[in-house]
């Protein structure tokens, strides 16, 4: 059974799990496996995903309880097209705010790199071009195989990593 689009125990979110998610996508040159561990103390409800380029084969897991992790994936569009997997997605949090997540796995590494970021928006906000641009052109993290952490505000913090390859893995933990 496919892992992407499912919820697992937060403690079991590992790179090995993300490797399995990548494997589910088959032989695609630009793809990403995303795992986000909810240790926020609250419940998240999926709003939507916005793909600037590329697509996904799975639905965002609808409800992510505390101590659970969501698994998601994206890939370049099928066929001989020069696109990457570039998207933002949003979860409404039980604290009344929105968790926004952005990733960019480009087609052309001569000009672009992997980038990612996480941000909390006040109130309920769906992912769209504006949310993507806000994070991509803000102060995103490079997908360089390094761990990063920051204070997200609202009593929450983030720790995460994204790999540098065209078959990318992104692992994030949101905690108090």
From Swiss-Prot:
Subcellular location: Secreted; Nematocyst; Target cell membrane
Motif range (Cell attachment site): 142-144
Important in the initial contact with the lipid membrane, annotated site positions: 111-112
GO function terms (MF aspect): channel activity; toxin activity
Region (Trp-rich region, which is important for the binding to lipid membrane): 104-119
GO CC, alphabetical: extracellular region; nematocyst; other organism cell membrane; pore complex
Region (N-terminal region): 10-29
Location of the region described as Plays an important role in the hemolytic activity in the Swiss-Prot/TrEMBL record: 2-11
Domain notes: Composed of a long N-terminal alpha-helix and a core region rich in beta-sheet structures. Before the pore formation, the alpha-helix binds the lipid membrane, partitions into the lipid-water interface and stabilizes the monomeric molecule on the membrane. Finally, it traverses the bilayer, thus forming the transmembrane pore.
Record-given protein name: DELTA-stichotoxin-She4a
């Amino acid at each position: 059974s496919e892992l992407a689009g499912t919820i697992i125990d937060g403690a079991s979110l590992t790179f090995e799990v993300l490797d399995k998610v990548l494997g589910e996508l088959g032989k695609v040159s630009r793809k990403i496996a995303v795992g986000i561990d909810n240790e926020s103390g609250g419940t998240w409800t999926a709003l939507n995903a916005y793909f600037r380029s590329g697509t996904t084969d799975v639905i965002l897991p609808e409800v992510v309880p505390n101590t659970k992790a969501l698994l998601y994936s994206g890939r370049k569009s099928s066929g001989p097209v020069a696109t990457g997997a570039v998207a933002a997605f949003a979860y409404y949090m039980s604290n009344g705010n929105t968790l926004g997540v952005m990733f960019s796995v480009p087609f052309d590494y001569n000009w672009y790199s992997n980038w990612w970021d996480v941000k909390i928006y006040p109130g309920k906000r769906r992912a769209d071009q504006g949310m993507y641009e806000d994070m991509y052109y803000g102060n995103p993290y490079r997908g360089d195989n390094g761990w990063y952490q920051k204070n997200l505000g609202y009593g929450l913090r983030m720790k995460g990593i994204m790999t540098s390859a065209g078959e990318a893995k992104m692992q994030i933990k949101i905690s108090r």
